[in-house]
Structure formats: C-alpha cells, structure tokens
C-alpha cells in the first residue's frame, strides 16, 4: 500500500467546514468525490486537522492510502478538473509508508486577517474581520507575548471542545501592520477548537482599550472561558501551513 499526500487550498465560505457533516456540504466530501472520479473508486482522506465552517486554508494537508498510485500529476491536475473554483489541490506527493497527515505534524501556522477601515471592503469581507475602531498594536503585541509558551489554554477553547488535555504550546504570535490590514500570525504545536479565534478576539479587545494587556495572564491562570475575549469571526482565519519533520518524498 502507498501513501499519497495532498496539500489543499480552499475558500471555506460555502462549506460546513473541512470534515464531513450530515447537515451540509464539507470540503472533505467535495475532494473525496473528485478523487473518486480520477481513481475509479472511493478513497478516504485523513487530514492534519479540521477547520470550522467559514474558515479557509492555504495549506491543509491530507493523505490517503492506495494499492496502486497514479502519477502525481493525476492527483493535481486530474482532481482539480472535478473541483469547484473554491477548492484546489496545490500539490501531491508519494510519501514514506509511515507518513500520517495528523500524527506526523509538528506544528501549524494560522493567519488571522483584520481589515481596519471606517468603511467595509466588499472585496475583503469573505476573508477578513472588518474592525472600524483604531487598534493599539503595541498593546496587542504586549498581550500576545503572554500567550507564547506552553500553557493551559482552557480559557481559550470553545464550549464544545472535547480535547483530552487543554495544554498546548504556542511558538509565536506576531502582529503584522500592513496599512489597512493587520495580520495575526499564530504558530504552535496544535490548537484547541476556536483557540486561535478566541486569542484574536481577546487581542482585539486589548487593542480597542477594553482590556489591559496584562489581563491575558490572569485568563490563562483562571482557565475560565468567560474570562477571555470574544470569538473572532470565522472568515478571517486561514490555515497557512502544516509543518513536518524533514522527510523525503518518494515521488512528487
């Protein structure tokens, strides 16, 4: 059996998320159906994680197992022929037998996009959070530094999160000032459900002056969701990259 890895980009706006759901169309379902047309039969994708409804991805990683792999071009160009405009396979590679999209991952990079302007942008609204108020980026950076490291992020998870442990390691939180745009780049070993969006919502509240930066430390220590900030809207979040230890492709 051979392991094929796909890197998938998608606009999550019209989907219920990455994972198959009984109540709507998911990115996983659409990609698996396109893959079945190319391969002549069903293949189940195992992803590096899941994204919620409305969240986007530049670098979602998924793998599947097949007894007779096709040329990698068939999984790129071939599958893309059957995908809608909102989804594309960016890369395909034949991997070592022990590669696993989820369990081989050593880190993830999420970017949250904030559009700051008194007037909304129709061209940006699908991929950003429109914030009309002025943001104190220095205060946001001060608060962001407190989130870096290995902590119990119980205060930064969704109420329905069923993770066995709420301890995670955040490698970095960078606030990037780009004229009308503010990007919050978060890198870590892994994240709880809605963790990045709650982190961003909290940082925006700090930037608006609604909370002092040092309050973030109390949130981490308290572990109560009610202490932390709002959950930033889904459309501003994008999974940029999933990191793996150096590993040679068999073919790609």
Swiss-Prot record:
According to its UniProt record, this protein's enzyme class is isomerase
Q: Does the keyword Calcium apply?
A: no
Stated EC number for the protein is 5.4.99.12
Give me the residues that bind substrate, please. Answer: 110
Entry GO MF terms? RNA binding; tRNA pseudouridine(38-40) synthase activity
Q: Which Gene3D superfamilies match?
A: Pseudouridine synthase I, catalytic domain, C-terminal subdomain, Pseudouridine synthase I, catalytic domain, N-terminal subdomain
Q: Which residues form the active site?
A: 52 (nucleophile)
Q: Which residues form the signal peptide?
A: none
Q: Which UniProt keywords apply?
A: Isomerase, tRNA processing
Quick check: keyword tRNA processing in the entry? yes
Q: What does it catalyze?
A: uridine(38/39/40) in tRNA = pseudouridine(38/39/40) in tRNA
Q: Which domain of life is it from?
A: Bacteria
Question: Which InterPro entries does the entry mention?
Answer: PsdUridine_synth_cat_dom_sf, PsdUridine_synth_TruA, PsdUridine_synth_TruA_a/b_dom, PsdUridine_synth_TruA_C, TruA/RsuA/RluB/E/F_N
Give a GO biological-process term: tRNA pseudouridine synthesis
Report quaternary structure and partners. Answer: Homodimer.
Known function: Formation of pseudouridine at positions 38, 39 and 40 in the anticodon stem and loop of transfer RNAs.
Protein family according to the UniProt entry: Belongs to the tRNA pseudouridine synthase TruA family.
Name of the protein described by the UniProt record = tRNA pseudouridine synthase A
The species this protein was found in: Syntrophotalea carbinolica (strain DSM 2380 / NBRC 103641 / GraBd1)
């Amino acid at each position: 059996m051979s392991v094929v890895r796909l890197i998938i980009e998608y606009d999550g706006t019209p989907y219920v998320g990455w994972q198959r759901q009984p109540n709507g169309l998911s990115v996983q379902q659409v990609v698996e159906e396109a893959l079945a047309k190319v391969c002549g039969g069903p293949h189940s994708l195992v992803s590096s994680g899941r994204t919620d409804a409305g969240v986007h991805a530049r670098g979602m990683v998924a793998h599947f197992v097949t007894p007779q792999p096709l040329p990698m071009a068939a999984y790129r160009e071939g599958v893309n022929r059957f995908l809608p405009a909102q989804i594309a396979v960016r890369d395909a590679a034949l991997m070592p037998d022990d590669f696993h999209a989820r369990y081989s991952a050593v880190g993830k990079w999420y970017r949250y996009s904030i559009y700051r302007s008194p007037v909304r942008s129709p061209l940006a609204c699908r991929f950003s959070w429109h914030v009309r108020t002025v943001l104190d980026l220095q205060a946001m950076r001060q608060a962001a530094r407190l989130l870096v490291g290995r902590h119990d992020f119980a205060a930064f998870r969704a109420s329905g999160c069923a993770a066995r442990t709420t301890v995670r390691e955040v490698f970095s939180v960078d606030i990037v000032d780009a004229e009308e745009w503010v990007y919050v780049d978060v890198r870590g070993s892994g994240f709880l459900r809605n963790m990045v969006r709650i982190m961003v919502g909290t940082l925006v509240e700090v930037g608006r002056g609604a909370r002092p930066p040092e309050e973030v430390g109390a949130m981490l220590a308290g572990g109560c969701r009610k202490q932390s900030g709002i959950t930033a809207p889904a459309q501003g979040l994008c999974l940029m990259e999933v990191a793996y230890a150096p590993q040679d492709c068999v073919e790609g």
